Amino acid sequence: MQTTKNQDDLVRIFKSILKEERFGSQSEIVAALQAEGFGNINQSKVSRMLSKFGAVRTRNAKQEMVYCLPAELGVPTAGSPLKNLVLDVDHNQAMIVVRTSPGAAQLIARLLDSIGKPEGILGTIAGDDTIFICPSSIQDIADTLETIKSLFNYAE
């Protein structure tokens, strides 16, 4: 069993393990990480990581209480690129909706307002984590959508 893996590997595998939504206790997470080669991992380290990455206990599809990392609860850091704050971009025939990390919508909306009409954005309304974008022209909504997606390197 390998015991010297770097911190990036630990974080990547930790997040991968939580995405499985089958670990109900910290000791189960410790055992899974040890099985992945992190022999020096312990419960207190797992507890700190759960807190750092905003993990919560919730019910999975089998109605078991498990730890998970919901995307919308991801905590941005000071070094996070703006594109990491955009979680989803969608639209209908009249409006574009952007979902962001909590607290990031007004920042992203201000950026979108600054590029404004030349890029097809008439205006925005932002809450905490959702932005409604009114395109300058409904006929050109597809172009405006592509502009927004490319601005944040968003790919579905």
From Swiss-Prot:
Organism expressing this protein natively: Shewanella sp. (strain W3-18-1)
Protein role: Regulates arginine biosynthesis genes.
Keywords: Amino-acid biosynthesis, Arginine biosynthesis, Cytoplasm, DNA-binding, Repressor, Transcription, Transcription regulation
Main location: cytoplasm
Entry's Gene Ontology cellular component terms: cytoplasm
This protein's record includes keyword GTP-binding: no
Protein name: Arginine repressor
GO molecular function: arginine binding; DNA binding; DNA-binding transcription factor activity
Pathway field: Amino-acid biosynthesis; L-arginine biosynthesis [regulation]
Subcellular location(s) per record: Cytoplasm
Coiled coil regions, renumbered to chain: none
Alphabetical GO biological process terms: L-arginine biosynthetic process; protein complex oligomerization; regulation of arginine biosynthetic process
Highest taxon of source: Bacteria
InterPro entries (alphabetical): Arg_repress, Arg_repress_C, Arg_repress_C_sf, Arg_repress_DNA-bd, WH-like_DNA-bd_sf, WH_DNA-bd_sf
Assigned protein family: Belongs to the ArgR family.
